[in-house]
Amino acid sequence: MTKFNQLQTKDDFAKLLGLKSAKYINYLLYNIKTDNLYNSFTIPKKNGGERVIHAPKKELKFLQKKLSNVLWECYLESIESKSKDKNFKTPVLSHAFEKGKSIITNSQMHRNKKYILNIDLKNFFDSFNFGRVRGFFIKDRDFAVSPEIATVIAQIACYQGKLPQGAPSSPIITNLITRILDYRIVKIAKKYRFTYSRYADDLTFSTNRELNSNKLRASKELENFLTELEDLIISSGFEINPKKTRLSNNMQRQEVTGLVVNKKINVKREYVKNTRAMAFRLYKDGAFEIDKTPGTINQLTGRFAFIFQIEQYNNYLLYKKSLMQNNLDSQKYLLGRNSSRKSESKYYWKYIFYNKDLQKELLHNTKHHTYNLPTEFYSIGKEEKKTYMSLFNSREKEYKKFLFYKYFFGNDKPIIVTEGKTDPRYIKAALKNLYQKYPELIEKEGNNFIFKIEFLNRSNTIEYLFNVPEGGEGFKFWYNYFSDKFYYNEKKRKKIFCTKFRRKNFIHKLHYLFQTINQ
């Protein structure tokens, strides 16, 4: 039994959302009307066309967030109660809009398979109309609310009679309603030995079975599977988009939710090349385009971060494999850039091993008949390493170069690098108290403060890519990235990438900052 099963009145429902009474809900639903509380706009789709987004205004968004949080609690409570039943195993089927799940976890299930079948549900959010949402909360045993409360929930969640794409309550409601569809589909998938997962409206099936059309039996089984699947989807109130239905084998490029999954999870090569080309144009001309429209540095940051996220995931898998095998042949590839994955340990890029660097007779483990690396390999320590940049692959190097440009060359405001991570917090607090004395650094408009400077956010990504320690020693590291004497490859005498950027822009901002502080 969940909290929703115990609701009797609107006031009970309001208290469940954290409100004192139902007055605020009634005011939005019947005085203002929820259909008047949306801003609509369009965004371009990847494959052409436009996607309509209906974003709720803050009054309604506040209420929808409350509803979303309570529904998530009920959803997790339901899964937890079922997981205690030994006879019931909760399958991981939906990977969208849930914490700890993503397009990566969705793609991982279908990696390195012979055949992959991609199916798209047409007009996914439009399929959830007012009556369907209301009926679900009445009939579903985890909720089983009264018709009055079910109507209120549907009124809060729906716009123009259906779930809007852009409302914070829509994702969880779609997951709740499609949960029964997932369970029914997975039964059919198991019958024909397919692996199934869903990411919102993207349904993916994969198998290592032979589905060659020349083999009549396999071809007939595939036809039966598709027929049963289509009948189930249509009877559940959805429609298949035939334009996006495709079957691919392992001799072709196989994609799942935009990621390539043939051997390992990867970003499409065209996406990486286009991102690099955009960055090159930005470095050279100070501007670039995305789909023939001017791009922003934040858009490019998102593209690089997405590529980097996939690289980090693959590095993590390599690291796990190395630890599991625990032998010399696999551990020699365990570069320092993966060290942050090792429990509480920090980076240990200090030791890079190759066969020629090791004396195998000293590292032989007689008990397990393996060659283990010395314990010093796992030592925690940071030291200035001029060859550190050579540890990264080309994609990581490009992201590092871009971040350096973004923070020190392409920034609109002077940037301050502090000694510690928490220093910006105290400096900002001091500037807010002294804003009248330093109008060059901060201004106040109404109740809000506008900073004319920025602080470098020492995130895990910055720490990982730049190898800059905390404390005063970190300033020396940042200086090295601007020094003409600093090389990331001593043998080839390749200088650090800052020499490729326009240094005058940074020097001008640096002088401006020092003059302002001295005043």
Question: Where are the language model's segments positioned?
Answer:
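Catalytic palm active-site di-aspartate
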Residues: 118-123, 166, 170, 192-214
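Short Gly/Ser/Thr- and Asp/Glu-enriched loop/turn motifs at secondary-structure junctions
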Residues: 197-201, 243, 411
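The start of beta-strands in P-loop NTPase/AAA+ ATPase cores
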Residues: 113-115, 196, 253, 414, ...
